[in-house]
């Protein structure tokens, strides 16, 4: 319930600002707004890591780093398109490749950095190998999921018999079809 607690409101607002920017850049429906579905803390001691995973049920996910000692492990994203690596393009070895052409992208944890990504993106967090002892060696972050919901008072489609306000067929509508 971190996303509804007052002490985490500023962090939530930062994530919502990024969500609004994504909405603008991607040309999403202006009748929707970003909503934080949930938020949780990650306190990772030496050796702690997160295996590759996704966040089903949300549009975007985020991580906000609060503490990240040296060698505490990066977050990395892999290209979900299995065939993308079947035939590699001949990139110029004398020039660094652009980030968007890589099959894997790593982001170092930096305190104050918020990373937002599509919830379907496969990602993993490397083990915390910080040599600092005690609380100073912990990797501390807050993660969450964000979805776009219709703004209050906006109907997705005109309601019609057997359908809800979002235009989905209801049980009443299904009964009439049989």
Model-derived features: positions:
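Aromatic-acidic/polar surface patches that form glycan- and anion
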Residues: 4-11, 55, 108, 135
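Non-heme Fe(II)/2-oxoglutarate
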Residues: 1-30, 49, 161-162, 168, ...
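Histidine-centered metal-chelating micro-motifs
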Residues: 49, 120-124, 131
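A short coil-to-beta-strand element that immediately follows conserved catalytic motifs
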Residues: 28-39
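Short edge beta-strand segments in beta-sheet-rich domains
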Residues: 36, 137-141
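Double-stranded beta-helix
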Residues: 76, 141, 145-178
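Catalytic core of non-heme Fe(II) oxygenases with the double-stranded beta-helix
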Residues: 41-116, 126, 137-138, 149-160
